[in-house]
Amino acid sequence: MTFAELGMAFWHDLAAPVIAGILASMIVNWLNKRK
């Protein structure tokens, strides 16, 4: 495994939960505003 592949794997492991958390918070805010 090269350094670039290691970096990509690390980025995906780090980015996936961050993006999921941002999407979840946006959905929660949207649902709260709709009430």
From Swiss-Prot:
Task: List the InterPro entries hit by this protein, alphabetically.
Answer: Toxin_Ldr (IPR025253)
**Induction behaviour:** Expression of the proteinaceous toxin is controlled by an antisense sRNA, in this case RdlD. Only a few of these TA systems have been mechanistically characterized; the mechanisms used to control expression of the toxin gene are not necessarily the same.
- For this UniProt entry, which segments traverse the membrane? 10-32
**Where does the protein principally reside?**
membrane
Gene Ontology CC annotation, any one: plasma membrane
**Top-level division of the source organism's lineage:** Bacteria
Q: Pfam families from the entry?
A: Ldr_toxin (PF13940)
Kindly state which keywords UniProt assigns to this record, in alphabetical order: Cell inner membrane, Cell membrane, Membrane, Toxin-antitoxin system, Transmembrane, Transmembrane helix
Coiled-coil stretches are: none
Similarity annotation = Belongs to the Ldr toxic peptide family.
What job does the chain carry out?
A: Toxic component of a type I toxin-antitoxin (TA) system. Overexpression causes rapid cell killing and nucleoid condensation of the host cell. Overexpression induces stress-response and a number of membrane protein genes. May inhibit ATP synthesis due to its insertion in the cell inner membrane.
* Protein name as it appears in the record: Small toxic polypeptide LdrD
- The species is Escherichia coli (strain K12)
Gene name of this polypeptide:
ldrD
